[in-house]
């Protein structure tokens, strides 16, 4: 039920006939460039994360100022 070497060769020939070798070469180079760009981006991201110092945690605003800004409301239910 699996694919044999003959099946894969026939499939490859059909793909080459449909798309042509130039188009397949362009697709391959575009895909390779995308993978290379992704790998470079991952390297830059990890380098920046290692170089950046850990930020000190900021204190949360006091509850007194939060209480002044809070609006107290009551929910009404439908009868």
Curated annotation (Swiss-Prot):
One of its GO terms (molecular function) is protein transmembrane transporter activity. It comes from the Bacteria. Keywords: Cell inner membrane, Cell membrane, Membrane, Protein transport, Translocation, Transmembrane, Transmembrane helix, Transport. The keyword Transit peptide does not apply. The chain crosses the membrane at residues 1-21. GO terms for cellular component: TAT protein transport complex. This is Sec-independent protein translocase protein TatA. It comes from Albidiferax ferrireducens (strain ATCC BAA-621 / DSM 15236 / T118). The gene is tatA.
